[in-house]
Amino acid sequence: MSISNSIRAQIPPIHPEGYPFIGGFALVSLILFWIFTPLGWIGTLLTVWCALFFRDPIRVTPQREGLVVAPADGRISMITRALPPAELGLGDRPLLRVSIFMSVFNVHVNRSPVAGRIEKISYRPGAFINAELDKASEDNERNSLAISTPHGKIGVVQIAGLVARRIVSFVREGQTVGAGERFGLIRFGSRLDVYLPDGTEVLVSEGQTAIAGETILADFDVATPGLTFRSQ
């Protein structure tokens, strides 16, 4: 392998959603260099940061019936029981909820936590309060997905935050997704909630760091053997 290929292999790809932002920062940086060189270097640093924000690295997803993987990079901020958003149709009883908070330094491409069929997608506008607060799940802008699996339905909710002002979805209702498959993105810091059926065993703890598509959040069936992995 050549040196250039070796370097390229170490640099994660950029998601196309980031191209307009990176291009905009780069253009502003060029203008700032023309006006005042130190400002141009500041603009260059911001351009690099923007490129890092939209990075989309390959992930190796554990493949086995019943596994639930992390849908986002970040910190497990809360594990509790809570009512799922009414628009998902998951019932009116509290379900187990695992929340992942994403800072502006995390990868923000979101991945499906399970293999299944997307039964419903519902977008709801709202506020932009701190995504770490519990009430953010009710008050903030959100995009909710109900995914049907052989073990029951789960809910995945993308929640906007103080900085995040744009939720992007790559999927549609009726589409079949695999565990770890990309389904959306939230720009510049946010949170994801996963609602799990009763009886699911949670395998993470609050404060733990999660890696989208790789960290196993929970297991529907701990007795099932045969764990394999897939890069995607």
UniProtKB/Swiss-Prot annotation:
Keyword entries, A-Z: Cell membrane, Decarboxylase, Lipid biosynthesis, Lipid metabolism, Lyase, Membrane, Phospholipid biosynthesis, Phospholipid metabolism, Pyruvate, Zymogen
Record: active site: S190
Site (Cleavage (non-hydrolytic)): G189, S190
Note on how the cofactor is bound: Binds 1 pyruvoyl group covalently per subunit.
Assigned GO CC terms: plasma membrane
Subcellular location as annotated: Cell membrane
Biological processes, Gene Ontology terms: phosphatidylethanolamine biosynthetic process
Membrane topology listed for this record: Peripheral membrane protein
EC number: 4.1.1.65
Top-level taxon of the source organism: Bacteria
Pathway noted in the entry: Phospholipid metabolism; phosphatidylethanolamine biosynthesis; phosphatidylethanolamine from CDP-diacylglycerol: step 2/2
Reaction(s) this enzyme catalyzes, per UniProt: a 1,2-diacyl-sn-glycero-3-phospho-L-serine + H(+) = a 1,2-diacyl-sn-glycero-3-phosphoethanolamine + CO2
GO MF entries: phosphatidylserine decarboxylase activity
Keyword Transcription: no
Keyword Transmembrane helix attributed: no
Record-linked InterPro entries: PS_Dcarbxylase, PSD-A
Family affiliation: Belongs to the phosphatidylserine decarboxylase family. PSD-A subfamily.
Oligomer status and interactors: Heterodimer of a large membrane-associated beta subunit and a small pyruvoyl-containing alpha subunit.
Name of the protein this chain belongs to: Phosphatidylserine decarboxylase proenzyme
Protein species of origin: Bradyrhizobium sp. (strain BTAi1 / ATCC BAA-1182)
